[in-house]
Amino acid sequence: MKIETIRTDLPKDVAVPEPIQAPRLKDILKASVNQNKSALGQIVAPSVAVSQPIFVGLTQENMAQGTVSLFPDRNPESHSLTIIGHHVQYDSSLLFGGIQELENGADVYVRYFDNYYAYKVESNRIIRETDLSELQDKGPNYLYLITCNSATETPYRVLVTAKKVTESPVKKVQAAFHEKQNAIQKKQTKTYCLKFLLPLLVVLILALVFLIYIWRL
């Protein structure tokens, strides 16, 4: 499941950034049942059923298990937060592809260390992957979400910009975060069973029937 042990500070050693390749479905499915590391936090976008852990270190492993804080030294208490994740063609709910469907005004919740934040989407647009100026630090009130605009290799990225809802009480934001996270978790569990486990079971049953048929010949 996509709920991690949440750290309370940055790790002393951050992995060296790796060249990131398009994700393979088998690697993502393997990672989804083998989550055994701590995360910096969790991002929840309820309108598109996205709930993913936030890791530090731009590596293939971290990107297969969730999302990555692109600039880990930028704490959302004093800086803009930038989160990047993969777009998976087979099912956008697996990782971060669902953010391309976020509409203006949509809610986004973030847990980062022990703090909770609520944001409202202000824009959702396509940029070139080289447009790093779009990710400039604008202070603590902004959140950037990034994914590829397709599941194949592409020079373009989806960039969602959201603004912090500063007037919401912390306890209300925390309660909303956990409520939406739990709802998405239940939905993802059902989706996983229907899309992956059920077809596998059908294949196994058909294989068994075929073997029995061959054995009786």
Regions found by a protein language model. Name each.
Residues 1-216:
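Solvent-exposed, non-transmembrane regions of membrane-associated and secreted proteins
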